Amino acid sequence: MTNVKTSSLGFPRIGLNREWKKSLEAYWKGNTDRETFLKEMDEQFLAALQTQLDQQIDIIPVSDFTMYDHVLDTAVMFNWIPDRFKDINDPLDTYFAMARGTKDAVSSEMTKWFNTNYHYIVPEYEKGAQYRVTRNKPLQDYQRAKAALGTETKPVILGLYTFVALAKGYEQQDIKDIYNQMTPLYIQVLKELEQEGVKWVQIDEPALVTASPEEAAAVKEIYQTITEEVSELNILLQTYFDSVDAYEELISFPVAGIGLDFVHDKGKNFEHLKAHGFPKDKVLAAGILDGRNIWKANLEERLDLTLELIQRAGVDEVWIQPSNSLLHVPVAKHPGEHLADDLLNGLSFAKEKLLELTLLKNGLVSGKAAIQAEIDEAHGHLQDLKQYGAATNSAFAEERGKLTEEDFKRPTAFEERLRIQNDSLGLPLLPTTTIGSFPQTADVRSARQKWRKKEWSDEQYEAFIQEETKKWIDIQEDLGLDVLVHGEFERTDMVEYFGEKLGGFAFTKYAWVQSYGSRCVRPPVIYGDVEFKEPMTVKETVYAQSLTSKKVKGMLTGPVTILNWSFARYDLPRKEIAFQIACALRKEVEALEKAGIQIIQVDEPALREGLPLKERDWDEYLKWAAEAFRLSTSSVEDTTQIHTHMCYSNFEDIVDAIEDLDADVITIEHSRSHGGFLDYLEQHPYLKGLGLGVYDIHSPRVPSSDEMLTIIEDALKVCPADRFWVNPDCGLKTRQPEETIAALKNMVEAAKQARGKLAQTV
C-alpha cells in the first residue's frame, strides 16, 4: 500500500489583504520603524504557514517567504553582493538597496522568473569575490516555525544549478569554478539543517527541465558531493513548469525524492515514467494541480491520474502537490468578492487548491466513494462555469472566419513608411518621449476610490482626470519632451483597464498576486469570447491632443500581454484567445487613427514571458504572437506610426520575433541590463525605430544627465541616430511626481547634448 501525503511547494507571501505589501511600503517610506516592520513580517510569515496547516497539508514549506524575492534571498545568503553595495554596513539596507537601488548605486537587474509574470532580482557574479554563508535563512525560518507553531516544516532552497543559470556576469568557462566554490556553501547550509533535525529539504531546480543529459550529469555530480556530506537529510529535488528532458539521468540522482510537474509537462513526464519507470527507493512528489491558473480542478480526472501514477510508479510513498509554488495565484477567495456565483464557484486560489489536495488524498486513501459528493459538486461547478462562458461565445467565430492573410501585414515596407512618417510627424533627431503612465498619486487613487464608491459622479471623476491630464501635458511641454502621453490616470492597470471594457473578461476586487517586490496585480479572468464593445481610449487621448500642438501617443496594451497577464480560459488554445483580443484591439487602433492620433503605442511587455521554456517550442509561439500583434496594428495608414514597448526580458532570444512584429518603433527596458543588449546589437544590428531606456524607473534614484548621455552615446555606437528614441525604461506610474520631473528634465537635457554632439560631427 502506497503511503500518500499532501505537500505544498510554496505559498503566496502577500496576505489576503496585501498586508505584506503595506508593511513593506510603510517601512520604505519611513512610516514604520524597523522593529514594527520586522514584527509585521514575522506575523505574515506565520499566517501563511497557519493557512496551510488549516488545510491539513502534511508537508509545509518554509523559507519560501521573503521580504522581497526568494532569488535575492539566496544571493544575499551566499554573499553575492555586488561591490557597489559593499559600503552599506546594515544587512537589511543592503538587501533592499540591491532590489531598489540607492542614490549612489543602481539596483540589480530584474527579469522574469522563467515564463511567469513574477520578476526576480538577477544575481551578479563577480570574479574574485569571496562567497560565504552570511546567514542560514532556511534554518532560521525552520526554527521560527517550530517555535511558534510547534510543527515540522520542509525548508525550501533554490538549487545551485538553477541559481547559477539565473545569474549573470560570468563566462562559460567560469561555471565549474562557481560550482566548486558554491557547493561547500550549500553543504554548510544543509549540514546545519541536518544537525537541527530537519527531516526533509526541498531543493528547487526548475532549470533542470531544459537541461540536456550531459548538463544533468554534471548537476548529478554536485548532488553526489552534497549527499555524501549530508547523508541523514532527505533531499527532495523539485522541478516544475515543464517536463524533464533528461528524465533517465534525473531519476538516478542520489536524492530521497523527486518532484515532477504533471500539469504543464504536455504529458511528457508521465510518458517518461511509463517508459523508464521510477526508482522504488525514492518518494515521487507529483504535481497534479495547476499552480499557475485559477480554475477549479476536475477532481475525478485528477484522482484517476494520480491513481495511475501510483500504479505505474510502484513506490512506497507519493506526495501529491500543486505543479509549482502557489506564489502565482491569489491567496484565497475573499469574502467580499463580487463575482457572479457561476464564475466564482469555478475558481480555486491557493487556499482552495490545498483543500483540493486534501480531498484527493482522502479519495486515494479511502476510495473514490469517500469524496463522491465533492467530486459531483466540483463537476457541477465546472458545468455552470462552462455555461456562464457560453453566453459570450457567439460573435467571434464569424469574424475569425473572415480573416485573410492581408489582415496580418502592413502593405508598405518599413523604410518607405519611415520616410512618409518623418515627413508627416516632423520630429527632431533623437526624439524624447515617455512610455505611457505618469505617477498615480494618493490624490489619483483617492479620486478613483470615491468614484467607485459612488461618492463622486461620473462627471466629477472625468473632470478630475482631465485636470490631471492637463497638468501633465503642461509639465511635458515645459520639460521639452517631443512626443507626449496623456498619463493614463484613468487606468488602474494596463490590462485590467482594457479587460473591463471588453466582453469575455471578469475582474476581481481582491484576487491579488505578486509581480515584483511589493508590486501586486489583479489579473483579469478570461472566461468567454473576447469582444469589442465601444472605443476604450479615444476620449482621453483626443482630449490630451486638444491641449497641445505636439503629437500625443495613443496607448494600448497588446494582445499577447493581455493574454499572458490574465488567467485565461482553459478550453481554447492560447493562440485563438490572442487572436480574439487582437481583433478587438484592431477596432480600437482604427478608432484612434480616425480621431486624428498619428502615433499609437501597442505595448507588449509580456511577449517574451509567454515563451515556452524549451527552445524547440519557441517558433510556434513566436509565430502566432507576432501574428496577433500585426492583426492588431496592420490596418492603419502609412502615416500612422506604430510603437510597441517591452520590458524585463532577455531580448536576444526574440529579436527575430521583434522584427516580425513590424512595429515602426520599439522601446525597450535597458538600464538594468547593464549594457548587455548593446553588446548583442553590435553583432546583430536592429534597423527599425528603437528606444533603449536611459534610466531605471523601478528605483527612486534620479540619475544625472551625464549618466543618461553616456547611455545614449553608447547606444548610438550600434544604433542609427536617425531612428533612435530617448525614453525611460518603463511607465512612471509608481514613481513620485518630484523624482519623475527631475529625471525627465535630466533625460531631455541628455538628449539635447547628444543632438549637439551629433551636429558637430556632421
Curated annotation (Swiss-Prot):
E.C. number: 2.1.1.14
UniProt: L-methionine binding residues: I435, G436, S437, E488, D603
GO-annotated biological processes: methionine biosynthetic process; methylation
Pathway note: Amino-acid biosynthesis; L-methionine biosynthesis via de novo pathway; L-methionine from L-homocysteine (MetE route): step 1/1
Keywords noted in UniProt: Amino-acid biosynthesis, Metal-binding, Methionine biosynthesis, Methyltransferase, Repeat, Transferase, Zinc
Binding site for Zn(2+): H645, C647, E669, C730
Superkingdom of the source species: Bacteria
Positions contributing to 5-methyltetrahydropteroyltri-L-glutamate binding: R18, E19, W20, K21, K112, R519, C520, W565, E609
Active site per database record: H698
HAMAP family membership: Meth_synth
Protein name as annotated: 5-methyltetrahydropteroyltriglutamate--homocysteine methyltransferase
Lineage: Bacteria, Bacillati, Bacillota, Bacilli, Bacillales
